[in-house]
Swiss-Prot record:
Name the UniProt record assigns to this protein: tRNA modification GTPase MnmE
Domain of life of the source: Bacteria
Positions annotated to bind Mg(2+): S231, T252
The protein's required cofactors: K(+)
The protein's enzyme class: hydrolase
Classification via HAMAP family: GTPase_MnmE (MF_00379)
Organism whose genome encodes this protein: Rhizobium meliloti (strain 1021) (Ensifer meliloti)
Residues in the signal sequence: none
InterPro entries, A to Z: G_TrmE, GTP-bd, GTP-bd_TrmE_N, GTPase_MnmE, MnmE_dom2, MnmE_helical, P-loop_NTPase, Small_GTP-bd
Length: 439
C-alpha cells in the first residue's frame, strides 16, 4: 500500500558541511515549498530562494529544485533545498518542516522505498544504490554502478522475456494444436532455447564468488609460528600500528583485522595468534580462533623466520592458495635457499614488500578489459537464480508438456523475485533498512 504522507529528511552527509541537502517528497511538497520560499520555482531548474519561517523570519538562502511527479527520484512531487551546512541552519529548516501540517520525518530508506513502489527502481537497482553509497573501492563502485544503473536488471528482464515467449508458444501448442496458424511442433526450437538459457543462468551463478570478493573483500590471513613477524607484516601492509610487536613469542592473543584497498579491490587482512602447542589458556583460545579464520581464508600468507618451518597443513582448507613468506631476511642468519620460500621479506628494511604486493595482486580476480560487471552480488540473487535453474532442469527432463510449462512459470517467478516484480513484500523491510534516513 502506497503512503500518502509527505516526508522530509537531510539527504546529504554529516554536519557541519559546506552544503546540506534537505529532501521533501509527497503530495504536500509544492505547498511546503510555497510556505518556505514564497513562490514555486520552475520545475527542474535550480533557483536561488530565501527560506523563511511562517512568521517571515529568514532561516537561510540557497538553491531550490522542484521535481513534479512523475519525473522525480521517488515518482512523487519532490524537492531539494541546497542550503548552508551548519547544524543550526539545518535544524531550523527541519523544525519548520516539522511544524508544517501533513509532513513527517522520513524513515530509513523511505525515499528509495517510494521509488521502488512507484516503479522508478526495481529491487536490484535499489540494492545497487545502497552498495554505491557504501562503496569504498573502485571495483565496488563499478559493481554497484552496474546494478544501480539497470544493467543487471536488463539481463534478468531479457531472460524473463525469453521464458514468457517459450511459455506462450507451449500454451498455444497445448490449447490450439488443431489450428493451422499454430506451428505443429515448436517444442524442438523452444527447448533448445530453454537449454541455452539454463546454461547462461548457471554461468551467471558461477560468477557469484567473484562478486562476493568485490563486495565483501578478499580474505587474506597471515599465519605461522609465534614470533614469525606476522604482526609486523600486518602493520607494514596497513601502514600504521595496529598490532603490538615485541620479541616475546605469543604476543598476539586474538585475531586482528584491517581493511585495505589493493588494485581497486577490497582486502580484509587478518593477523592471527602463532600456531603452536601451549598450556596457556588465553593463548590456546587465540590459536583456536586463528584456526577458525584460516579455515575461511581466500589466501594464506604463511610466515616463517627459519627455513623448513612452514607448517600449516593440518589446519589449511583444501584448495586455498598459500604464499610462503620468509621473514626477517635482513638478519645474517639463518641462510635461505631460493627454493625455501616464495617471498623473502624484511619489514624493517622494506626488502621484498614490492614482491609481496605483486604476489597478492596476482591472486585478485583478473577483470582487465571487462567494461560491465554483470554478476549476482547478493545471496538472495544466487538463491533465486538456483531456483530458476532447477526449474528449467526439471522442465527439460519432464515428459508431460503441461508440467514442463508449469516449470517454466516457476523459473520466471524466481527471476521476478530478484527484481521485486513477484512476491517480495517480506524482503522490503530488510533491504530498505540498509539506507540512511535521507535516502
Amino acid at each position: 500500500m502506497l503512503s500518502t504522507d509527505t516526508i522530509y529528511a537531510l539527504s546529504s552527509g554529516s554536519l557541519p558541511a559546506g552544503v546540506a541537502i534537505i529532501r521533501v517528497s509527497g503530495p504536500e511538497t509544492a505547498d511546503a515549498l510555497v510556505r518556505l520560499c514564497g513562490t514555486l520555482p520552475p520545475p527542474r531548474i535550480a533557483t536561488l530562494r530565501t527560506i523563511r519561517t511562517r512568521n517571515g523570519e529568514t532561516l537561510d538562502s540557497g538553491l531550490v529544485l522542484y521535481f513534479p511527479t512523475p519525473a522525480s527520484f521517488t515518482g512523487e512531487d519532490c524537492c531539494e533545498l541546497q542550503v548552508h551546512g551548519g547544524r543550526a541552519v539545518v535544524s531550523a529548516i527541519l523544525d519548520e518542516l516539522a511544524a508544517t501540517g501533513g509532513l513527517r520525518h522520513a524513515e530509513a530508506g523511505e525515499f528509495a522505498r517510494r521509488a521502488f513502489q512507484n516503479g522508478k527502481l526495481d529491487l536490484v537497482e535499489v540494492e545497487g544504490l545502497a552498495d554505491l553509497i557504501a562503496a569504498e573501492t573502485e571495483m565496488q563502485r563499478r559493481l554497484a554502478i552496474e546494478q544501480s544503473g539497470g544493467g543487471q536488471s536488463a539481463l534478468y528482464a531479457g531472460w524473463a522475456r525469453r521464458l514468457t515467449h517459450s511459455r506462450a508458444m507451449i500454451e498455444a501448442e497445448l490449447d490450439f494444436a488443431d489450428e493451422d496458424d499454430v506451428p505443429g511442433s515448436v517444442s524442438a526450437v523452444i527447448w533448445e532455447d530453454v537449454g541455452r538459457l539454463r546454461q547462461e543462468i548457471d554461468g551467471h551463478i558461477a560468477r557469484a564468488g567473484l562478486a562476493e570478493i568485490i563486495r565483501d573483500g578478499l580474505k587474506i590471513v597471515i599465519a605461522g609460528e609465534p614470533n614469525a613477524g606476522k604482526s609486523s607484516l600486518l602493520n607494514a601492509l596497513a601502514r600504521r600500528d595496529i598490532a603490538i610487536v615485541t620479541e616475546v613469542a605469543g604476543t598476539t592473543r586474538d585475531v586482528l583485522s584491517v581493511d585495505l584497498s589493493l588494485a581497486g579491490f577490497s582486502v580484509k587482512l587478518f593477523d592471527t595468534a602463532g600456531l603452536r602447542e601451549t598450556d596457556e589458556l588465553v593463548e590456546r583460545e587465540g590459536i583456536r580462533r586463528a584456526r577458525q579464520v584460516i579455515a575461511d581464508a581466500d589466501l594464506v600468507l604463511l610466515l616463517s623466520e627459519k627455513p623448513g618451518h612452514f607448517r600449516i597443513d593440518e589446519v589449511l582448507p583444501e584448495n586455498v592458495p598459500v604464499i610462503r613468506v620468509a621473514t626477517k631476511v635482513d638478519r645474517p642468519s639463518p641462510s635461505w635457499a631460493p627454493s625455501d620460500a616464495d617471498i623473502f621479506l624484511s619489514t624493517r628494511t622494506g626488502e621484498g614488500m614490492a614482491d609481496l604486493l605483486t604476489a597478492l595482486q596476482s591472486h585478485l580476480p583478473d577483470l582487465a578489459g571487462r567494461t560491465a560487471l554483470a554478476m549476482p552480488s547478493r545471496k538472495r540473487h544466487v538463491d533465486c537464480l538456483r531456483q530458476a535453474s532447477a526449474a528449467l532442469e526439471r522442465s527439460l527432463i519432464s515428459s508431460d508438456l503441461e508440467l514442463r510449462a508449469e516449470q517454466l512459470r516457476q523459473a520466471g517467478d524466481a527471476l521476478g523475485r530478484i527484481t521485486g516484480r513477484v512476491d517480495v513484500e517480506n524482503l522490503l523491510d530488510v533491504i530498505f533498512s540498509e539506507f540512511c534516513i535521507g535516502k
